[in-house]
Amino acid sequence: MSSRENPDTSAPMAQQQPQQQQQQQQPQPQQQQQQQQQQQQAQQTTQQQQSPQQPSQQSPLPAAAAAASVIAPVPLPQNGSNGAALGVTENLVCQWQGCQERLPTAEALYEHVCERHVGRKSTNNLNLTCGWANCRTTTVKRDHITSHIRVHVPLKPHKCDFCGKAFKRPQDLKKHVKTHADDSVLVRSPEPGPGTRPPNGMFGVGVGADGKCSLGHVHGQGYPHGAPQYYQTPHQQHPSNPSYGNVYYAIGSDSHQASYESKKRGYDALNEFFGDLKRRQFDPTSYAVVGQRLLNLHGLPLPLVNGAAVAVPEYQTQPMPAMVSVGHGGGHSGGGGYQPASPMQSYHLPPMGNLRTKADLMNIDQFLEQMQSTVYESDDHVAAAGVAQPGAHYVQHGGMSYRTSHSSNNANANANASHTATSSPPSAATNIPSTHATATTTTTSAPMIPTSSAARLLPTHAPRHALTPPSSAQSYTSGRSPVSVSSTHHHIPPSHHYTHTHNHNHNHPNSSAGMYPTLPATSAQDGSSTNTYHGVSGAAAPSTLSSVFDSEGGRRYAGGCCRGLDRGLWRRHHRRRQGSPSMSFAEVGGNDTKTASPSMSFSASVIDPALQAGSEKQSGSSGSGGEAGAGAGAGAGAGEERNGSSSSPTADVEEVSRALSSANATTTMATKTAPPEVPSHTVEQWVANVRLLEKLRLYIYERLSR
């Protein structure tokens, strides 16, 4: 019986053991390689305990029994905290190839990998390839691989100040901080103390004792004084918003902002203009193109001070808008309100990109010089623009007049004196200054304009503001400069010039003849030519300095003077004019001929005495019939010979007649080709262009000098 019961009892025991094994294996987690040593020790102790209890039992299933004995002593996880602790413990094992060393902390594990596996170049064991598990990442520097090892090690020393999240590498923290960009109004900054400027951010919040940003209420303690009375707000009975502390925002003056934007706009326009000059994007010899390009700079606040006397440095500081604080009812700062804050750091205008080097400045200065020569000295372009009138030296501009040629400032004559009758007082004729349109003692090559048109062109009042071209004050060698022009034109007889200059300076002691000598117009040496313009049509002849000023009055010149004039007669005439300044001369005006007595007429002094006596016998009064303003002395003598009876003609009379016909032809041509009256806006634009070019050149000069 016993032999039968034993197999029956052993069968249920063998069936219970696999069932227990399955029940215990279900909650059992997967075994790790790190626990092999503990499992072996537990297996040995279990076998020693089971061997005395079942000495007679044969083990038909030794593998199952061994497995059951091994599983029995392993403790099962009770809760999630134990599992987390187990995971942290497992992560502190070095998984470098060939190393299974366990470290107590993450810092120790990181130091272990860096020192033992990465090594150093100084110890000749530097390894730049990551051997953690199957990573195989290779770097070029030790710093790079040590930063890479932080990815494998659970060491997170970098914490976010906003949310407290920790990161392994500093670059990971920077990426995370960018996710808080939506919360940029909450910039962590300390509360401003007395005398300190507001934080860099537009808004400020408090900082807690633990170093993290505190979004709670922050008392206003930045400024010891209360808010201004006119901004004072009543005491709030209800608590303020606890989400923010003191808020800082800009309420800068709009005038400063507008001033900066205006200066910035002018600065950019000037920089663009200089860039066009460097790239030669327009023709500097075209008056229309230059005027159109300069028109873009008019009206803009260019960086020039007091007419470009001093150039403004490109790093010009401008005040920033002030920052103010708005308190939220702290009670310590005297209640809420607007608090004045100290100004922030100044900002500057950007540097000009087209004026970086000295070569740029010199090239632009040369280009501006070409433009200046075009505006000043191109007769054809200026005449086409309606600024220059043939034979006229002044252009009326509102209440002011500008001199457009190189002539003397003594030319501000009263044009109404041209219409003075012979019955006027003798002193009226002597006070008429010389101009190229009305002077009767200066031979001119400019087209003769009738007195009516001269009266319209010449101003009768207002002071003259000279716009002296650079060619008369500086060493410019342009094609229209006085040096080049005077060398290509003929010279005027100094006999006429000397006489007129002496009387003119005598009557006008306050004239500027010291700086500007009397500038006669150029004349053709041959008086018989019918066209005194050579290659210039419809444009103002340039008034230039004469290269020869001969003070000797005894020399004889051809053209306009009788050949029979001797040295003694000239000296007697000169002394007689000095003794009687009230001597009158022939007036020429329009188509009317004013006559003067032969004894008082200036024409009588330049005619041979024999011819003058014959003329007095034939006619009671003589007058000049010519309409010319210059060379009227010779014209008057020819008129006397024409109006009188037929006397024996001489060679001198024939020469005078030819000169008179030449002057009449020139006057007719000038009358036909005279342009209409100059529009005021054209003159204003020309003057603005002249002044702008002068300012720009002075600005470049200041930059070059620095």
UniProtKB/Swiss-Prot annotation:
InterPro entries: pacC/RIM101, Znf_C2H2_sf, Znf_C2H2_type. One of its GO terms (biological process) is positive regulation of transcription by RNA polymerase II. Residues 622-638 have a biased composition (Gly residues). GO terms for molecular function: DNA binding; zinc ion binding. GO terms for cellular component: nucleus. Residues 1-65, 397-434, 463-543, 573-679 are annotated as: Disordered. Keywords: Activator, DNA-binding, Metal-binding, Nucleus, Repeat, Repressor, Transcription, Transcription regulation, Zinc, Zinc-finger. Residues 488-507 have a biased composition (Basic residues). SMART domains: ZnF_C2H2 (SM00355). Residues 14-65, 404-434, 659-674 have a biased composition (Low complexity). A zinc finger (C2H2-type) spans 92-117, 128-152, 158-180. It is found in: Nucleus. Residues 1-13, 469-480, 520-534, 592-604 have a biased composition (Polar residues). Belongs to the pacC/RIM101 family. Transcription factor that mediates regulation of both acid- and alkaline-expressed genes in response to ambient pH. At alkaline ambient pH, activates transcription of alkaline-expressed genes (including pacC itself) and represses transcription of acid-expressed genes. This is pH-response transcription factor pacC/RIM101. The lineage of its organism: Eukaryota, Fungi, Dikarya, Ascomycota, Pezizomycotina.
